Amino acid sequence: MIQDEVPVSAQTIQWRCIESKIESKRLHYGRFAISPFRKGQANTVGIAIRRSLLGEIEGTAITYAKSKNVIHEYSTIIGIEESINDILINFKEIVLRSDSYETQKAYISITGPKDITAEDILLPPSVQAIDDSQHIATITKDITLDIEIEIQKDRGYRIQDSKESQAGEFFIDAVFMPIRKANYSVHSFGNNKKFQEILFIEIWTDGSLTPKEALYEASRNLIDLFLPFLHTEEEEIISDRDEKSESNGNILLSNSISTDIDRMAKEVAFKHIFIDQLELPARAYNCLKKVDVHTISDLLKYSQDDLRKIKNFGKKSVDQVLEALQERFAINLPRNKFSID
């Protein structure tokens, strides 16, 4: 049986990252394609993955701060521009990554004048500040600011009870949510005999983990959620099938890019990826835009000979396009309409 004749139910579902970019230290973006699904399956998976991304991914946050000679959170310290409340709000915004589930202690001991940022926090080895430039406070005089803080790893929100705190102690309402936003969409293709769906997932993170790490963790959490429903014998069968690469419809999170995924991505995904992702020089980019080449799908309609016929589009520009397509999408344009490289 040739590949195109394999039923959808017998094809291994696989995924690939079709777009990835770092918009800033605290904003990472990733777009993923997962397929093939039978009718209705993609929406089911999309809903579950999105909810898992938004509610089940663990994050790290500052949950407690302590400073001597401070009565309450609305106090001000002579020589510091911000009030204690402002400093606590700034602590809440600090993006951290931690490899430990234990409560970690960190310290700030800075003598002014100085602008205090996340870089000035003395963190334990297991904790990393994602953006060292995040502002905490500004010391305007020759005074020393000493603060002890606690860092924890959890998920969701945590509203602290400040009634139990003593003078100089401040419990911080923490947000353990590294996912800024998550969207999904489902696209259908094929005919009545072979109807398939492809799922696209978009993930924005705060930089404490990559979108790919977030997708893996969300998927793992969903799998763990269903494990109690499986018997030991069934788990052994699934394990054996995985070892023999004969699983039917199980989502395999691997980085391999199959021919099937490439073909479907060209038909659907590349229509939504703009040529900006190729990061071409201005000359080549502007020439393509002038002939209405806006997406990768538009570009794939051209052969190498077609590109050379574009006004002011020389050999160097063609080579730049070919190199970018190969590097980012593993695509080779044919030399002409009648050949395939």
Swiss-Prot record:
Reactions that this protein is recorded to catalyse: RNA(n) + a ribonucleoside 5'-triphosphate = RNA(n+1) + diphosphate
Residue span of region Alpha N-terminal domain (alpha-NTD): 1-233
Subcellular location: Plastid, Chloroplast
Keywords attached to this entry: Chloroplast, DNA-directed RNA polymerase, Nucleotidyltransferase, Plastid, Transcription, Transferase
SUPFAM superfamilies associated with the record: C-terminal domain of RNA polymerase alpha subunit, Insert subdomain of RNA polymerase alpha subunit, RBP11-like subunits of RNA polymerase
One cellular component (GO) term of this entry: mitochondrion
Any one GO MF annotation of this record: protein dimerization activity
Family annotation (Pfam families): RNA_pol_A_bac (PF01000), RNA_pol_A_CTD (PF03118), RNA_pol_L (PF01193)
Keyword Plastid appears in the UniProt entry: yes
BP-aspect Gene Ontology terms: DNA-templated transcription
SMART domains: RPOLD
InterPro entries in the cross-refs: DNA-dir_RNA_pol_insert, DNA-dir_RNA_pol_RpoA/D/Rpb3, DNA-dir_RpoA, RBP11-like, RNAP_asu_C, RNApol_insert_sf
Domain of life: Eukaryota
EC number(s) reported in the record: 2.7.7.6
Annotated segments matching region Alpha C-terminal domain (alpha-CTD): 262-341
CDD domains attached to this UniProt entry: RNAP_alpha_NTD (cd06928)
Gene3D superfamilies (alphabetical): 5' to 3' exonuclease, C-terminal subdomain, DNA-directed RNA polymerase, insert domain, RNA polymerase, RBP11-like subunit
Similarity comment: Belongs to the RNA polymerase alpha chain family.
Subunit structure: In plastids the minimal PEP RNA polymerase catalytic core is composed of four subunits: alpha, beta, beta', and beta''. When a (nuclear-encoded) sigma factor is associated with the core the holoenzyme is formed, which can initiate transcription.
Record text about domains: The N-terminal domain is essential for RNAP assembly and basal transcription, whereas the C-terminal domain is involved in interaction with transcriptional regulators and with upstream promoter elements.
Function field: DNA-dependent RNA polymerase catalyzes the transcription of DNA into RNA using the four ribonucleoside triphosphates as substrates.
This protein's name: DNA-directed RNA polymerase subunit alpha
Organism of provenance: Angiopteris evecta (Mule's foot fern)
Lineage: Eukaryota, Viridiplantae, Streptophyta, Embryophyta, Tracheophyta
Gene: rpoA
